[in-house]
Amino acid sequence: MQAGKALKTAAAFMLSVAMLATGAACGTSDDSDASASKSSSKSSELTGYDVSGVKKDDAIAKMLPDYVTKDGKLTIGMDTSYAPAEFLAADGKTPVGFDVDIAKALAGVFGLEADPETANFDSIIPAVGAKYDIGISSFTVTKERLEAVDFVSHFNAGSAWAVKKGNPNKVDTSDLCGKKVAVQTATMQETAANKMAKQCKADGKAEMDVISSKLQTDVTTNVVTGKADVFYADSPVAGYAIAQTDGELETLGKTEGIAPEGIVVKKGDQQMDEALQK
């Protein structure tokens, strides 16, 4: 299902703003090096797009199911390790990023208070319709996910590879056997990487080590610190990380696998589906 005009316009604008920003970077895990920590502080300085002018649309608000409107809040599950889409501000608590702004804009249209909640990426889809009203966290629309939930797509993105500057480990994405590949847990990139690893084994080649992390910030850090040879992520996230790590990372190859990304809705919830498409 496709998003309505307002949602698509907001998504395109906020994504372009985020990708043009030059004063921010992915955060890091506790074991990151000094340069990665420095880039983390930059990430926290980003401010969101002002959506306070978004007004309630009574006709759309009336379409919402009771379970969404009863508490006056739009509760959104999101993985806040995924800059520039969603990450935490300098206080370490406040979600910011273009997905957060989209969530706030939607809440404004619905006449609700936006309540973005931090969650591990792989825990969001199972909780939509119960703990969360919707999920917004750069979810690629896949056949497998559509078996569990509905999606309203709002923009397209691909996947990209990132390595240390100069590709010192001679990574060739056409043959990753013998390499260490960092990915985020439960992403389509993890699925693809595991498939490649199985093929290496089937072909009798050197083992490909897939390093999965719950947080995208840790995925990026694994390459910066040398724990992994390359990471594989959504193209906006990869491009953002590369641009903001003080020249430590670079893109390897071209963006591939362009596919729709979307907002997660409870399976069969026609009211919410239609409200998001207006």
Question: Which residues does each PLM region occupy?
Answer:
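Sec-dependent bacterial lipoprotein signal peptides
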Residues: 1-24
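Bacterial lipoprotein signal-peptidase II cleavage site
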Residues: 22-38
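Extended ligand-binding regions for polar small-molecule ligands
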Residues: 27, 41-58, 108, 167, ...
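Extracytoplasmic small-molecule ligand-binding "clamshell" domains
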Residues: 42-135
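Periplasmic-binding protein-like
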Residues: 80, 155-163, 243-277
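Bilobed "Venus flytrap"/periplasmic-binding protein-like clamshell domains
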Residues: 95-108, 139-141, 157-215, 230, ...
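Acidic, polar ligand-binding/catalytic clefts
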Residues: 113-174
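A ligand-binding cleft/hinge motif common to bilobed small-molecule-binding domains
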Residues: 139-146, 194-195, 224-257
